[in-house]
């Protein structure tokens, strides 16, 4: 009996040590991503400025191949800017203290839609929502959460007009369960966990642009608010993302 207890304690100590090492490793990776992303911004800004200058001064004055090469370089700088800014945003969310206040989720959704107005106009997307509640949240992070989920719903479409609907209902624990439903390309159930991982992509860059960080950022935001995020979907049949947030301590049931 004594030997069994000793072995169990050794195993528990080993697991605890490994968990601490993993946590430290994750923190170091996040710090590296933040530093690398920050330090890469200035040289990329310089490259982008000079390529734009070339485009303005020499477009149409050289041969067709030159115009094509300059256009490719411009496109490359745009994609590089996204590759740099997304990890930086993730690391900032991971490091920032979450300031919880009574927040109108309807207002934060509207802020997100303003940020997405270009994509909404280009795709002719229809974005509707039910009356949404006041919750305990960091307003900027909740805006980012809605922006990522609605932005993905607009982006991951093959044919037709994106249709997105946002709703909320109280769950059994008295928390608000939000749903973001779309009519997009859907997700195979075997990839449900994978889509929330860092740099995880289910499609090639040629099919859909992106860094594979968007849903990982959503997961980080929700978890830092003490909630959970999940997805229901079938390939080709649209997706519904669910996330939970605490109700407002002030007892405001619905946004005005």
What kind of feature is each model-predicted range?
Residues 1-4, 181:
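PAS-family sensory domains
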Residues 11-18, 22-25, 29:
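PAS/GAF-family sensory domains
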Residues 75-80:
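Short alpha-helical segment of the dimerization/phosphotransfer core of two-component systems
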Residues 153-154:
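Short helix-loop "hinge" at the ATP-lid/N-box region of the Bergerat-fold HATPase_c
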Residues 187-199, 241:
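Short conserved segment of the HATPase_c
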Residues 214, 218:
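Short alpha-helical Gxxx[C/S/T] motif in the catalytic ATP-binding
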Residues 226-232:
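Glycine-rich ATP-binding loops of the HATPase_c
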């Amino acid at each position: 009996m004594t030997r069994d207890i000793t072995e169990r304690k050794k195993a528990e100590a080993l697991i605890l040590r490994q968990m601490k090492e993993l946590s430290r490793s994750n923190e170091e990776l996040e710090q590296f991503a933040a530093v690398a992303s920050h330090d890469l911004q200035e040289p990329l800004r310089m490259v982008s400025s000079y390529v734009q200058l070339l485009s303005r001064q020499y477009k149409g004055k050289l041969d067709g191949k030159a115009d094509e090469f300059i256009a490719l370089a411009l496109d490359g700088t745009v994609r590089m800017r996204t590759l740099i800014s997304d990890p930086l945003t993730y690391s900032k969310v991971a490091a920032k203290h979450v300031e919880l206040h009574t927040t109108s989720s309807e207002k934060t959704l509207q802020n997100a839609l303003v940020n997405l107005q270009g994509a909404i106009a280009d795709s002719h997307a229809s974005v509707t929502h039910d009356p949404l509640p006041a919750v305990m949240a960091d307003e900027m992070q909740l805006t980012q959460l809605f922006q990522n989920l609605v932005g993905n719903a607009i982006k991951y479409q093959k044919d037709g007009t994106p249709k997105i609907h946002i709703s909320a209902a109280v769950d059994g624990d008295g928390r608000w369960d939000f749903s973001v439903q779309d009519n997009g390309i859907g997700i195979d159930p075997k990839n449900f966990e994978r889509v929330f991982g860092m740099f995880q992509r289910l499609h090639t860059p040629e099919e859909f642009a992106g860094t594979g960080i968007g849903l990982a950022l959503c997961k980080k935001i929700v978890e830092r608010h003490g909630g959970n995020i999940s997805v229901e979907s079938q390939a080709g049949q649209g997706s519904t993302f669910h996330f939970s947030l605490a109700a407002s301590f002030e007892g405001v049931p619905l946004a005005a």
